[in-house]
From Swiss-Prot:
Protein name (database record): Histidine ammonia-lyase
GO MF annotations in UniProt: histidine ammonia-lyase activity
Family recorded in the similarity comment: Belongs to the PAL/histidase family.
GO cellular component, one term: cytoplasm
Length: 505
């Protein structure tokens, strides 16, 4: 059970919450702050003060005063009218993440909701009732209005949820769990939907998958180095310390550890003086992607604990301030950066695939075919990898450089952060498949070189891989092999803290 405070949630805890289904509870001190802040909102309504989002309309209607008797109707109308998402739903892990992050931001005690609302969000998390939230429709400012409205709907007993492996109406799940839908009071509708939790939840899942994929890429690249009898000198510690990037030094160190007892690597001058960049520069390229991942993790952990709705309430109600914390620009930039970092891992992997299958670049059978000419072997797998990396180049176009005004030009600059976050996740799926193709080719190359000559670590990884796909002895439908390896990589390693050398043993 993980305790939410509004201030301390980490990526490592989100791994447990999203991928292992761990439950959550609220910090009592934080809940007390929620209750105290709520008293401020109720006094504002009782006194008839004009405060945006509490006693006024929204967006362009901010100058419309709402009568006390209409405050509840205002909240309900807001949720229904803003539930305008379209397209396929977010993965269930993302909608679960949205519930967690929305509760966590409310626990900062500046949003003005009742403790009841926070408790309802936590009930949904712990009972694994996850909103069906369409992926499209958010501009990323005022936050993720459309996606979060679909989240808010289910608290009211409306909309759909994922529940016990099925997609059902929210009331079906609520009834089975013995829960009553809530009725929103002043400000609560706006507090639920004005924030960055869709882009951030998707970003967290993307980061978790990207981190695992980056570690896996090092193991797979190490197998390729063996298959191509790569020169180990390029990974010497002195080379990488001379440049000074910690991430580069770390990648080189891990690859040295992975290959320390390999009989397939060579020394410079034995077979050739130096390798092509896709082998020799693995620490420099993979290390740069790790720099991206470290940046993204830092920004996500800030946003996971951020108050991103509007207005915010401070100093016991002395200050009720309309600001712009809902603007998703920091996450939009981070997700665009993540897209580039992961696309590059796929790019260099595809070049290693080419070196494994091209007979002009190695002494292996052409396209790793058991009968070159009669059987095509891995020829079209390289085509597939090339297609995926080219698609990634399109998806990697920065969403954050775009903006389009909305709400009668009141909201005249937006982040497109949710588009960036969604595209980052797509790129990661593509990158994993490219790496799966590289792994299939590297395993085949290892067989030609002699499995007994592999390092202890890569040999273990090879045998695990062969449990997923057999050796290429005849042409077959390789699409199934690629998907099997990709699924195995995702499900067997994505919940680990990291893929270290011992994880493969």
């Amino acid at each position: 059970m993980i305790t939410l405070t509004g201030h301390t949630l980490t990526i490592e805890e989100m791994k447990r919450l999203l991928l292992e289904g761990e439950g959550v509870t609220a910090c009592p001190t934080s809940m007390q702050k929620v209750a105290e802040c709520r008293e401020v909102v109720e006094k504002i309504v009782e006194d008839g003060k004009v405060v945006y989002g509490i006693t006024t309309g929204f967006g362009k209607f901010s100058d419309v005063l709402i009568q006390k008797d209409d405050v509840k109707a205002l909240q309900h109308n807001l949720i229904q009218s803003h539930a305008c998402g379209i397209g396929d739903p977010f993965p269930e892990e993302v909608s679960r993440g949205m519930l967690i992050l929305r509760a966590n931001t409310m626990l900062k005690g500046v949003s003005g909701v009742r403790p009841l609302v926070v408790n309802m969000l936590l009930e949904f998390v712990n009972r694994k009732i996850h909103p069906v939230v369409p992926q499209q429709g958010s501009l990323g400012a005022s936050g993720d209005l459309a996606p979060l409205s679909h989240l808010a709907l289910v608290l009211l007993g409306e909309g759909e949820v994922f529940y016990k492996g099925k997609r059902v109406h929210a009331m079906v799940a609520l009834t089975e769990e013995g829960l009553e839908p809530i009725e929103l009071e002043a400000k609560e509708g706006l507090a639920l939907i004005n924030g960055t939790q869709a882009m951030t939840a998707q970003g967290v899942l993307s980061y978790i998958e990207a981190e695992a994929t980056a570690y896996q890429a090092e193991l797979i690249a190490s197998m390729t180095i063996e298959g191509l009898q790569g020169i180990i000198d390029a990974f010497d510690e002195n080379v990488h310390k001379a440049r000074g990037y910690k991430e580069q030094v770390d990648v080189a160190s891990r690859i040295r550890d992975i290959l320390h007892d390999s009989k397939l690597t060579t020394k410079q001058g034995e077979l050739r003086v130096q390798d092509a960049y896709s082998l020799r520069c693995i620490p420099q390229v993979h290390g740069a992607s790790w720099q991206v991942l470290n940046y993204v993790k830092e920004k996500l952990e800030i946003e996971m604990n951020a108050a991103t709705d509007n207005p915010l309430i401070f100093d016991g109600g002395e200050k009720v301030i309309s600001g712009g914390n809902f603007h998703g620009q920091p996450i939009a930039f981070a997700m665009d950066f993540l897209k580039v970092g992961m696309a590059e891992l796929a790019n260099i992997s595809e070049r290693r695939i080419e070196r494994l299958v091209n007979p002009q670049l190695n002494d292996l059978p052409p396209f790793l075919s058991p009968e070159p000419g009669l059987q095509s072997g891995a020829m079209i797998m390289q085509y597939a990898a090339a297609s995926l990396v080219s698609e990634n180049k399109t998806l990697a176009h920065p969403a954050s450089v775009d903006s389009i005004p909305s709400s009668a030009n009141q909201e005249d600059h937006v982040s497109m952060g949710t588009i960036a976050s969604r595209h980052a996740h797509q790129i990661i799926q593509n990158a994993r498949r490219v790496l799966s193709i590289e792994m299939i080719c590297a395993m085949q190359a290892a067989e030609y070189r002699g499995i007994e000559n592999m390092s202890t670590v890569t040999k273990s990884f090879y045998h695990q891989g062969r449990q997923q796909v057999p050796s290429i002895t005849n042409d077959r439908i390789f699409s199934t092999d690629i998907e099997n390896i990709a699924h195995w990589l995702k499900t067997n390693y994505s919940i680990k803290e990291r893929l270290d050398v011992n994880a493969a043993l």
